[in-house]
A protein has these predicted regions:
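ABC transporter nucleotide-binding domain
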Residues: 175-267
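ABC-family P-loop ATPase nucleotide-binding domain
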Residues: 1-10, 307-313
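A short linear hydrophobic-aromatic micro-motif
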Residues: 123, 251-255, 286-291
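A generic structural signal for secondary-structure junctions
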Residues: 79, 96, 105, 123, ...
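C-terminal coupling/interaction segments
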Residues: 268-313
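Short beta->alpha junction loops/turns
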Residues: 67, 236-238, 269, 293-294
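ABC transporter nucleotide-binding domains
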Residues: 4-6, 11-208, 214
Length: 313
């Protein structure tokens, strides 16, 4: 079953196509990453999917509801954490959570239980009586994410939810979200931290200049588009004559990090590595260690955006 289905969805402002005929299919219970550079159309897409703005053209179904014709029905079943902080400055953390539950008509007994659970889960107990205006950026962000779990929802939109969080708190939040997805919650997740997307997302779409340029799982994106490989070799020693021989190998870039370490970058890594090993063996240079560095999502993202930009010029 799909939580989000978009067909030829577009949003135009005058002559500018902010979102240009995109298709999306987000399955229920998955964490779906939505990545793109600044100005790519991410924010406009989120506003379309959360019914904050209507599309210029195209079809949009959210949780099986026609979101263009029945936006209020959609809003009653989703949660949204936008990038801009939203809070009442004079309310305490505890009262912020409780009031948000009241807005969603959550009964008092259930609200009280959920407040305590979320204060514990998001490490907010020690600041429960602190006013929102006195919180740090990271603390406000935690409150903003936590309060969405005061009500029952089937689909959650998160726009840069880890801004201002330290690494430990960030990982704890990501694990919490992954567990929620395993319980059936669908999460639409945007971030500029590509390692986050690689860790949490089941599937990823990359948008650039209003168009979707790739959709796949993180692993499949790396397998499909990860052309260049990086190999590190630790040697017992290397002199200039050997480095000159290595520099003459085609189809690669070699960095000599010190007298004993070299890093090879190549999209023909197997062929290049054989040539390097032959040179080292012929000159009796022992290899202390050899390791391949896997392609990461950030490299794929940059490569695809660069290719997309070049294709549009």
């Amino acid at each position: 079953m799909s939580s989000i289905t978009a067909n030829s969805l577009s949003k135009t402002y005058g002559s500018i196509k902010a979102v240009d005929g995109i298709d999306l299919n987000v399955r229920s219970g998955q964490v779906f990453g939505f990545l793109g550079p600044n100005g790519a159309g991410k924010s406009t897409t989120i506003k379309l999917l959360t019914t904050l703005i209507p599309p210029t053209s195209g079809q949009l179904s959210i949780l099986g509801i026609d979101a263009v014709k029945k936006p209020l029905r959609v809003r009653n079943r989703i949660g949204v954490v936008l990038q801009q902080p939203s809070y009442e400055p004079t309310l305490s953390v505890e009262k912020s959570l409780d009031k948000y539950g009241m807005m969603w008509n959550v009964p008092q007994k259930i609200r009280k239980k959920r407040v305590e659970e979320l204060l514990e889960e998001f490490n907010l107990k020690e600041i429960r009586h602190k006013k929102n205006d006195d919180l740090s950026i990271g603390q406000r962000r935690r409150v903003q994410v936590a309060r969405e779990f005061m009500h029952d929802m089937e689909l959650l939109f998160l726009d840069e939810p880890t801004v201002g969080l330290d690494p430990t708190t960030r990982r704890k939040l990501l694990d919490f979200l992954k567990n929620k997805a395993k319980s059936g919650l669908t999460i639409f997740y945007t971030t500029h931290v590509l390692s986050e997307a690689e860790y949490i997302c089941d599937e990823i779409a990359i948008i650039n200049k209003g168009k979707i340029i790739a959709v796949d799982s993180p692993d499949d994106l790396k397998n499909r588009f990860g052309r260049e490989k990086t190999i590190k070799i630790h040697l017992s020693g290397i002199d200039k004559s050997i480095s000159d021989l290595l520099n003459n190998i085609d189809d690669c870039k070699i960095d000599f990090n010190s007298g004993t370490n070299i890093t090879i970058h190549s999209d023909k890594s197997e062929t290049v590595l054989l040539q390097i090993l032959q040179i080292l063996n012929n000159n009796n240079i022992p290899i202390e260690d050899l390791s391949a560095i896997p392609t990461n999502l950030e490299e794929i993202f940059l490569q695809m955006v660069e290719y997309s930009d070049a294709s549009n010029n």
